Curated annotation (Swiss-Prot):
Purpose: Provides the (R)-glutamate required for cell wall biosynthesis.
Annotated GO biological process: cell wall organization; peptidoglycan biosynthetic process; regulation of cell shape
Organism field: Listeria monocytogenes serotype 4a (strain HCC23)
Protein name according to UniProt: Glutamate racemase
Enzyme Commission (EC) number: 5.1.1.3
Pfam families membership: Asp_Glu_race
Family assignment from sequence similarity: Belongs to the aspartate/glutamate racemases family.
GO molecular function: glutamate racemase activity
Matching PROSITE patterns: ASP_GLU_RACEMASE_1, ASP_GLU_RACEMASE_2
Active-site residues, as the UniProt record annotates them: 72, 183
Residues holding substrate: 9-10, 41-42, 73-74, 184-185
Disulphide bridges, residue numbers: none
SUPFAM superfamilies: Aspartate/glutamate racemase
Length: 266
């Protein structure tokens, strides 16, 4: 029987990481939990985000996952090291992979980070980037409206274009040549962000690099699945199953997927 890779996120954003993982590892089984009912995590304090992240973690661990991907930047910043220390399965976040990808892409060591308020205030990206390259200069920008645009399914709309243009205006006057999408919801807005920032700016989706690290970690722990056993992906949400399904079907190209509603916390 296949063991699944577990993914947790504040909502649908982590599906951008799932998509990249399934591209690279098509034999793997996925269990995904999106805490849509309590989304967004960005404005919440670190202790509350850590509590919610543990609740999601325990839910998936109880279902026998072999690895955990914290597919949410805010949750990674709040709880990754504590969870990694206490679980006996491999645990990975999305901040280090995104930082590594940005440093590969930049030509002038000037990098912008787009994130939730919680991720920006945590200084997790500047810390990670400077830990890998002390010469790098980082401009961080909180984009609190992006998550709600994605969660409402408006990420291809004229509203999305307006929100992106208004939010990213401060970055246009900087000399950054690389932008990290420091929230896993943001890749759904990537075409609009790329269009606004222009050809000279590389836009980094940490999902691709995260997927490569998932593959390497599974290989290291001898957990890679290459069998043709039947795959049964499972998707859980604390919010609307229909909204979740509409976005997930579009993003993952899984027309027959089912989504289960669950409750977390008290």
């Amino acid at each position: 029987m296949k063991q699944a890779i577990g993914f947790i996120d504040s909502g649908v954003g982590g599906l951008t990481v799932v998509r990249e993982v399934l591209k690279q590892l098509p034999h793997e089984q996925v269990y995904y939990l999106g805490d849509t009912a309590r989304c967004p995590y960005g404005p919440r304090d670190k202790e509350e985000v850590a509590k919610f992240t543990w609740e999601m973690t325990n839910f998936l661990v109880d279902r026998g996952i072999k690895m955990l991907v914290i597919a949410c930047n805010t949750a990674t910043a709040a709880a990754l090291y504590d969870i990694r220390e206490k679980l006996d399965i491999p645990v990975i976040g999305v901040i280090q992979p995104g930082s590594r990808a940005a440093l590969k892409a930049t030509r002038n060591n000037k990098i912008g980070v787009l994130g939730t308020l919680g991720t920006v205030e945590s200084m997790a990206y500047p810390t990670a980037l400077k830990g890998l390259n002390r010469r790098v200069e980082v401009d961080s920008l909180a984009c609190p409206k992006f998550v709600s645009v994605v969660e409402s399914g408006e990420y291809k709309s004229a509203i999305a274009k307006k929100v992106v243009a208004e939010s990213l205006l401060p970055l246009k006057s900087t000399k950054i040549d690389t932008v990290i999408l420091g929230c896993t919801h943001y890749p759904l807005l990537k075409p609009i962000i790329e269009n606004f920032m222009g050809d000279g700016v590389a836009v980094i989706n940490s999902g691709e690099e995260t997927a490569s690290e998932v593959s390497a970690l599974l290989d290291y722990h001898n957990l890679l699945d290459s069998t043709d056993e039947e795959i049964e992906h499972r998707f859980f949400t604390t919010g609307s199953t229909q909204i979740f399904k509409d976005i997930a079907k579009d993003w993952l190209n899984m027309p027959d997927m089912t989504v289960e509603h669950i409750k977390l916390g008290k």
